[in-house]
Amino acid sequence: MASDVISINLSDEAATDALAQRIAPHLLRGDCFLLEGAIGAGKTAFSRALIRARLGRMEDVPSPTFTLVQEYEDPEGDIWHCDLYRLTHPDEAFELGLDDAFEHAICLIEWPDRLGSDQPANASRLAFEALANGHRVTIHLSDTMRPRLSGVVGFA
């Protein structure tokens, strides 16, 4: 993991959308965001905005809470949006095909702690926190994503 860390206050849904729109065009196959935070902290809202920005259209992006995985076809790399909250063991994640997705898709993983020690080493971590007025996201960019995203998210 990178030592670079930045926190961004997102005052409303439009600010979350804007951040996702800045990030989306720079993602490549094999990129993974580990999305941390309590229920209602903004993980799904960010994922929804990033998926829509990446696909370039208003897409129905439901929370994968009950399906565990929602997959979206993108010519430049499929997008996997995963909610692992209901998993009880890391092996269950790999029964879903996540190991292959980590290599060949763009992955947005909510509740990544369910992966245990099997979290991808090249993943960036976004920690969301609900505030009285909006949300805060603390971004830890991985070494592989830092060159493409550091200027986009505000690292010097």
Residue ranges and their predicted role:
Residues 38:
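P-loop (Walker A) phosphate-binding loop of NTP-binding proteins
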